[in-house]
Amino acid sequence: MKVLGLISGGKDSCFNLMHCVSLGHEVVALANLHPEDGKDEIDSFMYQSVGHDVIPLYAECFDLPLYREKIGGQSINQNLDYQFTEKDETEDLYRLIKRVLTNHPDLEAVSTGAILSTYQRTRVENVCKRLGLKSLSFLWQKDQEKLLNDMVVSGLNAILIKVAAIGLTRKDLGKSLAEMQDKLLTLNKKFELHPCGEGGEYETLVLDCPLFKKRIVLTDKEVVEHSSGEVCYLKVKACVKDKPEWQPISLKSELVPNEELLGEEYSHIYHTISKKYELIDDQEETPTSLIPIPLRESAFQQKKGSFLVLGNVVATKGSYNTFQGEAESAINNLNELLGTYGYSNKNVYFVTVILSSMSKFAEFNSVYNKYFDFTNPPSRSCVAAPLASEYRIVMSCIVGDVTEKRALHVQGQSYWAPANIGPYSQSICANGVVFISGQIGLIPSVMELKLHDKIFEMVLALQHANRVAKAMRVGSLIACLAYVCDSRDADCVVKIWSEYTKNTGESSPVLVALVDALPRNASVEWQLLYNDSSCDVPLLSSLVTNQTLFGSDTAWDVALLNQNGLRMESSFIHHEHPSAYAIVLNNAFPNSQLLHVRYTARDQNV
């Protein structure tokens, strides 16, 4: 993609550009926001301003056009999740990038150096979404000790230009990251200082990196101390000098250390399962065939405690002639049902979508996106399965008060986990329950599913789900649902889950559901349910029974809660063989059965 590099002069924005080039992206321009003339630094939650006088030199160093804009706004909207706010400093960024687009209409993405700052990330993502661009944030959630070392070994020469933390003094100003690395790690152990300065402990100025055709040399520097005496920074003058040794950098050059797809824990799971388990050859066993899911004509509705559950929401017969019309009718019916309870689309926590064919995924999303086009939309799982009716879309959702909701909606591409550029959040936490969206084994940095090792894909998808859970600061694990497209993969999924729970010490059942297809032709989709860590007493716990239900197939699972919780209905797609188990989830209180998932045979009433 053609990329605009947002630069502050600091190490993070520059190092992210190195990752962009390593991944094959072409940086076509640079952009920077700076204080008004005569100001060395401003109090901004969003932008690094110290050292801004040197920024014009970066155009010559990169040999790229540089676009700049004065910061005229203030931090008016200080919520973590940003929405358009007049005179906010984020709107300065919007105007800047919009101006760049007029000169570079083929621009596709924006590079940003966000590591831990949700405040910064959500604002860049908001601007990118409004302008039809992607956000590339390859440093997001990276381990800071490793990241600091990666910067040093990659030839990024950055000096400390501001210090504002215990243990850092004016004597450290002007020192390089390489010179400061040991001290920063020592301060991390003593005082929990962020090694990469994510707590505002220090700021840097990049003098050279492999992408620079020329390097920056300081010609004068002056230490400026704040009135408190604990914060000081360098006011510098600089010039550009040639780099006779510089060689042109081609796209996909190895400018940064290789990023392993699997973390240590999941790499161990992968190698353990690979040694113990061989996928069944296609010729050795015939995959199980799916039986179409029977649908009821009326929607399932239950309001209990803090939650409302709506299931079996379909279009109105005779109200549509096209698939788009069916999608609009189904969503209108969902909206009407919500209205009868005094709710709107913003009250929805989680949505389960079943399509008759995954070929309709993009077309459905185009309609769905219009309905849930707001900050932090519901989390979601979407699968395809044959439906025993004329309907091609079935939806179920869990609903509640928005005042109790917090969300994770990361839209920038990174190495962390797949970006959710679609109309759903990675996770929603509400009323003590954390709903994780279904996760598939996409390679997050490129958002592609191009793995030829099915076990690796399954483990990677589980890692994605767990990383989302960690970012949500979840409590105890309640249950796991794994969708598979081939019945022969079920045993492997169970073994992976067993190894995962053994390593983590968590105890939770896994339910494996057979479907016709998953997004991107994935082999598995993991969907996790957690208690919120803020609850003194976990709302839900789980155990597996050996109850067996007989029937030609099973169609629905039903979850029941008492007045403190929810009744949840989501579609289960099973084959002709009956389930050999049921799952029971109970409140920690012995006399209160909070959640009971049961399988209902096709010919039984739900």
Curated annotation (Swiss-Prot):
Q: Which GO terms describe its molecular function?
A: ATP binding; diphthine-ammonia ligase activity
Q: What reaction does this catalyse?
A: diphthine-[translation elongation factor 2] + NH4(+) + ATP = diphthamide-[translation elongation factor 2] + AMP + diphosphate + H(+)
Which EC number(s) does the record attach to this protein? Answer: 6.3.1.14
The record, for InterPro entries, names:
Diphthami_syn_dom, DPH6/MJ0570, Rossmann-like_a/b/a_fold, RutC-like_sf, YjgF/YER057c/UK114
Q: Give a single Pfam family match.
A: Diphthami_syn_2
CDD domains tied to this protein: AANH_PF0828-like, eu_AANH_C_1, eu_AANH_C_2
Q: Which GO terms describe its biological process?
A: meiotic cell cycle; protein histidyl modification to diphthamide; regulation of cytoplasmic translation
- Chief site of localization: cytoplasm
What is the annotated localization of this protein? Answer: Cytoplasm; Nucleus
**Gene Ontology CC terms, in alphabetical order:** cytosol; nucleus
From the UniProt record, give the pathway where this protein acts: Protein modification; peptidyl-diphthamide biosynthesis
Mind telling me which SUPFAM superfamilies this protein's record contains? Adenine nucleotide alpha hydrolases-like, YjgF-like
Keyword Ligase listed? The answer is: yes
Q: Which UniProt keywords apply?
A: ATP-binding, Cytoplasm, Ligase, Meiosis, Nucleotide-binding, Nucleus
EC supergroup of this enzyme: ligase
The family assignment reads: In the N-terminal section; belongs to the Diphthine--ammonia ligase family.
What's its job? Amidase that catalyzes the last step of diphthamide biosynthesis using ammonium and ATP. Diphthamide biosynthesis consists in the conversion of an L-histidine residue in the translation elongation factor eEF-2 (eft201 or eft202) to diphthamide. Has a role in meiosis.
The protein depicted here goes by the name: Diphthine--ammonia ligase
Q: In the UniProt record, what gene is named as encoding this protein? A: mug71
